[in-house]
Design a protein with these regions (language model features):
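N-terminal Rossmann-like NAD(P) cofactor-binding subdomain of oxidoreductases
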Residues: 1-211, 234
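Charged docking surfaces used in two-component/phosphorelay signaling
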Residues: 192-253
Length: 253
């Protein structure tokens, strides 16, 4: 790419949003020109909004320090240069996250979301590029089904644990070794649970043997990723049975 794509990050002051900013700093394809968060942070310079609450080991990227945080619901204030939006929103009600992401899509923005809010919507692709890049073929159906403009859509990434093992399972199947049953045990970092998990006293020198909702995601999301696109949405596969135990361990990343 000769020119970088100007992007926005929603939920930029939270832990996942901070990680987005860290990863996109000096990226060859993307340049962050817009950061959005809750009304509490809106109107502040980004460095001031996360003062005392920056959770990354690296320093705040220089390219975003002076960006003024936009209220995530203030569409009128979005920089006109923004062509793509990364969503790290984690609103208390997932329905609000789901609806707000589609509001951005209706405004003409491609939404690439880290949130789980839209993962189980039939017309939303959940992509691991090495496995199911063809699932982007559902996007025209999503746009037609929801009356979205040609430039607007929602696509999501899977839960953090999925890409650690599903690429291997897919490679086995592609090589002619079909997998029928899988037993998965994950040891997931504190960072996956957000700031509240990192600061929790119960996590010091401890392993939590259960993470609410994680086992369901680990067992079910692969079925969508390994599924196929139909005229009415993405059809999950039924050829594999996954059983998961998910634990939280006291490491940051």
């Amino acid at each position: 790419m000769n020119e970088k794509l100007y992007v926005s990050v929603l939920g930029a002051t939270g832990m996942v949003g901070q990680n987005y900013l860290r990863l996109l700093e000096n990226h060859p394809w993307f340049q962050i020109v817009d950061v959005a968060a809750s009304p509490r942070s809106a109107g502040k310079k980004y460095a001031d909004a996360v003062d005392g609450n920056w959770l990354m080991q690296d320093e705040i990227p220089n390219s975003v320090k002076d960006l003024v945080v936009r209220d995530v619901r203030d569409f009128d204030a979005i920089s006109e240069n923004v062509k793509c939006v990364f969503s790290a929103m984690d609103l208390p009600d997932k329905t609000d996250t789901r609806n707000l992401e589609f509001e951005y899509a209706k405004a003409g923005y491609p939404i690439i979301s880290n949130s789980s809010a839209n993962r189980w919507i039939d017309d939303v692709p959940m992509i691991i590029p090495e496995i199911n890049p063809d699932h982007v073929d559902i996007i025209p159906f999503q746009q037609s089904n929801r009356n979205l403009p040609a430039s607007g859509f929602v696509a999501v990434k899977p839960n953090c644990s999925i890409q650690s093992y599903l690429v291997t399972l897919f490679a086995l199947e592609e090589a002619g070794f079909p997998v029928d049953k899988v037993q998965v045990t994950t040891l997931q970092a504190l960072s996956g649970g957000g700031q509240a998990t990192i600061t929790s006293l119960e996590m010091r020198e401890n392993v939590i043997p259960f993470i609410g909702g994680e086992e369901e995601k680990t067992e079910n999301e692969p079925l969508k990723i390994l599924g196929h696109v139909t005229n009415a949405g993405i059809q999950n596969t039924d050829r594999i049975d996954i059983s998961a135990t998910c634990t939280r361990v006291p490491v940051i990343d």
